[in-house]
Amino acid sequence: MSFPQLGYPQYLSAGQAAVYGGERPGVLAAAAAAAAAAAAAGSGRPTGADLGSSSTAAVTSVLGMYASPYSAPNYSAFLPYTTDLTLFSQMGSQYELKDNPGVHPATFAAHTTPGYYPYGQFQYGDPGRPKNATRESTSTLKAWLNEHRKNPYPTKGEKIMLAIITKMTLTQVSTWFANARRRLKKENKVTWGARSKEDDNIFGSDTEGDHEKNEDDEEIDLESIDIDKIDDNDGEQSNEEEDEKLEHLRQGEKESFKKESEVMIPSSDGLKSKDSLSLGKESSDTSNTRIVSPGGQGNIQVPPHNKPKIWSLAETATSPDGALKSSPPPSQANHTSPPIQHPAFLPSHGLYTCQIGKFHNWTNGAFLTQSSLINMRSLLGVNPHHVAHHNHHHLQAHQQAPLLATNLSSLSSDKTPERTSPKHSDRENLPRTESPPQLKPSFQAVRENTLSQQEGTSRILTALPSA
């Protein structure tokens, strides 16, 4: 076998030499010499020439594959490099400079400008490319502005038209008109009304309202506007605004001070203690309620039970319960008000808690004694005997209050001899506004409680057999 396409000839026989004789003439000669040598060997008489020729043929046949290894082999099964095929005829050279069309096909148009690859939308030579505002481009804008001096606000459609004519962007056109309007205001002091909203709504302008609201927010043309004057105007406006704010603050402080003074000043309640002044914020001047004792000898002022105001919620939450229930010293002025029972004496219908030491009195209801019946409040309200006991206690307290006042006055007259002078005697004849103190000794309260308990026990003992 031989592979002449790859250039590797092998040992050939006589039959094979005929096959490849037309392709390889050198191989054919070597094959003929080898055949002659074989015939001579078969005859049995080899000669020296035959031996030399046979050895030469063997060496030639062996070295035939190395005879011309680099002699331009013709690979008919593959594409040749020397001849240009019609498939790649339109392709240029692969190793040319980039200034040439390169490997691009001839049908594709290469860049006309060598070495320029645009990143933007337009090229340098494109007439649609936007450019800076010049005198030629702004002449159209000036002409439109002269025609519309009364209303120098172009609509969205007019801006688009002017931008196409002047080859500018919409932002450039809007900025130019804003600066032009500012120049007109400063030079000619021209004032014009607000632009019509109908034209703006037709084209759906979304940025034009900003120019209408405030012209000072637009861009400023530094070449045509005096910056110092603008700064002075801004300073004057800021000073005026600060003065107005100060005036508003002062007026608000005066109004708040008046309201506080109206709340703090009492109408005709006489002398008040600090507790009553603190409670005065919660009450109005005309809604003071008083409680008349059963004896009718004195008036007890009670803090009103109206709706608390907002600023007093913190005080009511933090103040103890005793401060709200304590009543200030009453005055001797007679106020005709209907008798109102104190809320502590009113019957309540809630469940009450008991002390831990008296818990057995609540649980062991079958073993209640007479004293526990007196001191125990029912689960549905106040015991009627308890109400009578409280009324009797307050009646005796008010009857003994003038006696205590006279005793105190006699003691004070003994200690101060100046009170007997005529100057002080005149003052003593005047009606006093001071009220007798409501402080009661503790032993009186204990004695009264024992008396009232004995009366209550007698009433309960008389009521039990009847039941």
Swiss-Prot record:
Its main location: nucleus. The keyword Nucleotidyltransferase does not apply. Expressed in the neural plate in overlapping patterns with other irx members, which all share an anterior border of expression. Also expressed in the mesoderm, placodes and notochord. Broadly expressed in the tailbud rhombencephalon (hindbrain). Outside the nervous system and at tailbud stages, expressed in the developing otic vesicle, branchial arches, prospective heart region and pronephros. Residues 215-225, 233-244 have a biased composition (Acidic residues). InterPro entries: HD (IPR001356), Homeobox_CS (IPR017970), Homeodomain-like_sf (IPR009057), Iroquois_homeo (IPR003893), KN_HD (IPR008422). One of its GO terms (biological process) is maintenance of kidney identity. SUPFAM superfamilies: Homeodomain-like. One of its GO terms (cellular component) is nucleus. Keywords: Activator, Developmental protein, Differentiation, DNA-binding, Homeobox, Neurogenesis, Nucleus, Repressor, Transcription, Transcription regulation. Residues 126-188 bind DNA. Residues 447-460 have a biased composition (Polar residues). Residues 245-262, 415-431 have a biased composition (Basic and acidic residues). This is Iroquois-class homeodomain protein irx-1. The lineage of its organism: Eukaryota, Metazoa, Chordata, Craniata, Vertebrata.
